[in-house]
Amino acid sequence: MKKVIREIISISKKLSLVFKSIKEIYSYGGYTTTNISYINHGDILKDKKILITGGSTGIGFNIAKKCIQEGATVVITGRNEGKLKQAKEEINSPLVQTLVWDISQINKIEESIVCAQELLGGDIDILVNNAGIVNGVLFPNVTEEIWDKVYAINSKGLFFLTQSLSDKWIKETRICPKKIINISSQGGFVGATYPYRMTKWDIAGLTQGLGIKLAPHGIIVNGIAPGIVSTNMQPNCQGQKENLFCPQNPLKRFALPEEIAELAIYLMSDASNFIVGQTIVCDGGYSLK
């Protein structure tokens, strides 16, 4: 009798999920789950020391989690101390540390690099430039204040942090290459007239230029251009809750931040050492249209 009751309860739970999914599909025309593969490389980043800007949520947070799973020590940065604390608690590993850092404050870069290295217990091996903000104001309503704020974080801060760290690396002698991963966007490849997408175009161009400039010094630079990702930077996605439907690409769904993290790990690893200056588009086919 107990076995029958357990079976009934189990079936009821499954039916509840089915009905919920049907309701979501009816509301949004999409689906609530998708399958992605997680590769267990086996400590492919063991003992690497990694700095991830904008790591308290979304893509940066998921990259941090995956780095730690692969044996790295990580410092994640952000402007909001509360969000950083929450991220650290969720990751729940001694391999992650946090650093409150507004990357737009150029005069704080040198000091912040020193702080990050102290938290990591040594020199930085990999930089992930992920910090970025979005402002939805479109041309012709963009003000100088909006422009400056977006560019200060997305483009200017990234440039001068990369400059400062690569200058230090160039002066060093090493066997293993250093790595820089720049998080751009597929929006940077389709043309735009508002600051967010324009900064992402900047980043893709900088990635190519730095790839050429820094490779002879043992510094490998690459980038990732995600499509529309299910994070808090996508209010439409958040409004759909678990539903991942997105009509804007051939796969008809949002990307998951974990998928971007899988690609980032590959680019950080020695398996990608012959890839230089490339920005890999991961957008479900959106930019093919």
Question: Which residues are covered by each model-predicted region?
Answer:
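Active-site helix of classical SDR
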Residues: T162, T199, T207
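Substrate-binding pocket helix/loop in short-chain dehydrogenase/reductase
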Residues: L138-F139, T143-D148, F245
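Conserved glycine-rich cofactor-binding loop
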Residues: S56-G58
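Non-catalytic terminal and boundary segments that flank Rossmann-like NAD(P)-dependent oxidoreductase
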Residues: M1-D47
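Short C-terminal tail/terminal secondary-structure segment
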Residues: N35-S37, V190, I265, V276-K289
